[in-house]
């Protein structure tokens, strides 16, 4: 749901709260108000995160660490995409193409891979990715070393399947961020369902209260009075 539509829903709830007098109605509207405010906050955080990711992509991916012999740097910056047959992970490491071939090692399992780059500018670099979203073919997976880049090729066990995420953990985190109601429906449907349930379950006084608050809020909006 677009942020603008969420803001309109929030304003509508605030108008109804001003008019409602029944405790049950106010409690339901207050709960709906909190849900909408939380979703607006999540939308803003997602926008900020996307901006931060765009800025990170413009920076060198190699992690900078003090030059200490034997020190291992954990790789956290990478990019990935996919084809019908492979999931491809790109790791940028300055000068990696100049180290001996045997210094770049990748170990694959059906649901993970482990990259270790030894002795690159006095440090080692490690990247471990567990719980891949789907199984891969260990025998069909490989790595390539290009200029300043390590390319890891994970062969999909089932070809022509799409990976929406790289790992199962990432998928679960994204699904937890989804709102509890269907965001593909009409923007006001969540609020309307709450009011409809209260109306259907309420007595005559409650129905009159909701009807009065609804009519007055509509009249107020029609006149352009949007003070909240």
Swiss-Prot record:
Q: Which residue ranges are recorded for the region named Interaction with SKP1?
A: 73-228
Residue ranges constituting the SGS domain according to the UniProt record: 168-228
Protein localization? Nucleus; Cytoplasm
The gene for this chain is CACYBP
Q: Which InterPro entries match?
A: CacyBP_N, Calcyclin-binding_UBL-bridge, CS_CacyBP, CS_dom, HSP20-like_chaperone, SGS_dom, Siah-Interact_N
**Organism the protein comes from:** Macaca fascicularis
Q: Which residues carry this modification: N-acetylalanine?
A: 2
Q: Name one GO molecular function term.
A: ubiquitin protein ligase binding
Q: How does it assemble?
A: Component of some large E3 complex at least composed of UBE2D1, SIAH1, CACYBP/SIP, SKP1, APC and TBL1X. Interacts directly with SIAH1, SIAH2 and SKP1. Interacts with protein of the S100 family S100A1, S100A6, S100B, S100P and S100A12 in a calcium-dependent manner.
One Pfam family linked to the record = SGS
Q: Which GO terms describe its biological process?
A: heart development
User: Positions modified as N6-acetyllysine?
Assistant: 8, 19, 85, 118
Name of the protein in question: Calcyclin-binding protein
Which segment of the chain is annotated as a signal peptide? none
Q: Post-translation: what modifications? A: Phosphorylated on serine residues. Phosphorylated upon induction by RA or at high calcium concentrations.
Q: Which keywords accompany this UniProt record?
A: Acetylation, Cytoplasm, Nucleus, Phosphoprotein, Ubl conjugation pathway
Domain CS spans what residues? 73-167
Chain spans, region Interaction with SIAH1: 2-80
The reply on keyword RNA-binding is no
Q: Which domain of life is it from?
A: Eukaryota
């Amino acid at each position: 749901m677009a942020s603008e539509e969420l803001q309109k829903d929030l304003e509508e709830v605030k108008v109804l709260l001003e008019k409602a007098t029944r405790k049950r109605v106010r409690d339901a509207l207050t709960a709906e108000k909190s849900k909408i405010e939380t979703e607006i906050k999540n939308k803003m955080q997602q926008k900020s995160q996307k901006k931060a990711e765009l800025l990170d992509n413009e920076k060198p991916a190699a992690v900078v660490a003090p030059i200490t012999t034997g020190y291992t740097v954990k790789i956290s910056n990478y990019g990935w995409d996919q084809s019908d047959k492979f999931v491809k992970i790109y790791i940028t490491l300055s000068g990696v193409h100049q180290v001996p071939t045997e210094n770049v090692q990748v170990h694959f399992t059906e649901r993970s891979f482990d990259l270790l780059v030894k002795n690159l500018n006095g440090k080692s670099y490690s990247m471990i990715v567990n719980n891949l979203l789907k199984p891969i073919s260990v025998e069909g997976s490989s790595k390539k070393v290009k200029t300043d880049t390590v390319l890891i090729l994970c062969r999909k066990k089932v070809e022509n399947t799409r990976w929406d995420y790289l790992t199962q953990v990432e998928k679960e985190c994204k699904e937890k961020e989804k709102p509890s109601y269907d965001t593909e429906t009409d923007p006001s449907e969540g609020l309307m369902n709450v009011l409809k349930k209260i109306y259907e379950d309420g007595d005559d006084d409650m129905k009159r209260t909701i009807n009065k608050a609804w009519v007055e809020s509509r009249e107020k909006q029609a006149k352009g009075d949007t003070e909240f």
